[in-house]
Curated annotation (Swiss-Prot):
Keywords: Fatty acid biosynthesis, Fatty acid metabolism, Lipid biosynthesis, Lipid metabolism, Lyase, Membrane, Transmembrane, Transmembrane helix. It comes from Caenorhabditis elegans. The keyword Nuclease does not apply. GO terms for biological process: fatty acid elongation; sphingolipid biosynthetic process; very long-chain fatty acid biosynthetic process. It comes from the Eukaryota. Catalyzes the third of the four reactions of the long-chain fatty acids elongation cycle. This endoplasmic reticulum-bound enzymatic process, allows the addition of two carbons to the chain of long- and very long-chain fatty acids/VLCFAs per cycle. This enzyme catalyzes the dehydration of the 3-hydroxyacyl-CoA intermediate into trans-2,3-enoyl-CoA, within each cycle of fatty acid elongation. Thereby, it participates in the production of VLCFAs of different chain lengths that are involved in multiple biological processes as precursors of membrane lipids and lipid mediators. The active site is at 142, 149. It is a multi-pass membrane protein. This is Very-long-chain (3R)-3-hydroxyacyl-CoA dehydratase hpo-8. Its main location: membrane. The chain crosses the membrane at residues 15-35, 44-64, 86-106, 137-157, 176-196. It is found in: Membrane. GO terms for molecular function: 3-hydroxyacyl-CoA dehydratase activity; very-long-chain (3R)-3-hydroxyacyl-CoA dehydratase activity. The lineage of its organism: Eukaryota, Metazoa, Ecdysozoa, Nematoda, Chromadorea.
Length: 218
């Protein structure tokens, strides 16, 4: 299998997976599911396709794609932590309004992003509407996603603290302690410099790519 075939297959599978999550999320919201019920309706697909994104870090490391390793690793790690240590282990997190916010933001973003990547790998022209969506919807989707992630994270803190989830207390053979509660607090604080930097970067990219929008459409 060629690298191109592999990358196309990966991106197409991600498009299908996140499309399924998006459809289930919209239907769940339309049918008035509670936030825990909404999460349960997409839990299987969410765990599979978000965990599969770890491959993107490997793609960047071995040079299959030109994505920066550090940025890719941080973005993937933050989501994987939300899916597994937080939403999987902390039932209270599923009651947060952050759940529908992050599900909508993630799924719409990923369907657009992977469609963009698939066409890029195939060296096909990117339709203007796809460029427009990719470099416009982030104005709403990024704040929505970050809000959803933080609200879900905050909703898990009490349970993490009470149950000592993923926490290593002293004394122990390693003679060291690790508090997952503090790990989450530090992760939340990292959004303060991280979000504005990424947000304004995307604004710059939008001006660069869509600045001559009328010419591109022609």
């Amino acid at each position: 299998m060629s690298v191109q075939t592999y990358l196309v297959a990966y991106n197409v599978l991600q498009i299908l997976g996140w499309s399924a999550i998006l459809v289930k999320t919209v239907l769940g919201l339309a049918n008035g599911l509670t936030w825990p019920q909404l999460y349960e309706s997409v839990e299987f697909e969410l765990k599979i396709f978000q965990t599969a994104a770890i491959l993107e870090v490997i793609h960047a490391i071995v040079g299959l794609v030109r994505s920066p390793v550090g940025t890719t690793a941080m973005q993937v790690t933050s989501r994987v932590v939300l899916v597994w240590p937080i939403l999987h282990l902390c039932s209270t997190a599923r009651f947060s309004i952050g759940v529908p916010l992050l599900l909508v933001a993630w799924s719409v973003t990923e369907v657009i992003r992977y469609s963009f990547y698939a066409l890029s790998v195939l060296k096909q022209p990117i339709p203007y509407f796809l460029l427009y969506l990719r470099y416009t919807l982030f104005y709403v989707l990024y704040p929505m996603g970050v809000s959803g992630e933080l609200l879900t994270l905050f909703a898990s803190l009490n349970e993490v603290d009470e149950k000592k989830i993923l926490t290593l207390e002293m004394p122990n053979r390693l003679n060291m302690g690790i508090s997952f509660w503090w790990v989450l607090i530090i992760a939340a604080l990292s959004y303060i410099p991280g979000f504005p930097q990424l947000y304004f970067y995307m604004i710059g990219q939008r001006k660069k790519i869509l600045g001559g929008g009328s010419k591109k459409k022609q």
